[in-house]
Amino acid sequence: MKAFIVILSIAIVLLLIVSIKETSAKDCKQECVKRYTNGDFTNFFKVEYGPERRGGKCYCEFTCRVKFYIHLKHEMN
């Protein structure tokens, strides 16, 4: 029974980590588009999110060969 609780706890923690990363990647994409095209997704090519301590690093790339990095800061509630 204890092993089941441990496995369940680990699964919940991993699920939380994945959901935080997905949310951060979505925030990254929105921030890239907002900063470069004022919300227009037509020239958007790709975004990569790398988690860091107290935030993350976004790599933004557009079809017109514009590439840049953004540092996101996560606010702690």
Swiss-Prot record:
Species lineage: Eukaryota, Metazoa, Ecdysozoa, Arthropoda, Myriapoda
Keyword Signal: yes
Record's subcellular location: Secreted
Keywords: Disulfide bond, Neurotoxin, Secreted, Signal, Toxin
Protein name as it appears in the record: Putative neurotoxin 2
Broad class of the protein's primary localization: secreted
Annotated source species: Scolopendra mutilans
Tissues expressing the protein: Expressed by the venom gland.
Protein family per UniProt: Belongs to the scolopendra neurotoxin 3 family.
UniProt PTM: Contains 2 disulfide bonds.
Residues annotated as signal peptide: 1-25
GO molecular function: toxin activity
Cellular component, GO annotation: extracellular region
Pro-peptide region(s): 26-46
Source organism, top-level taxon: Eukaryota
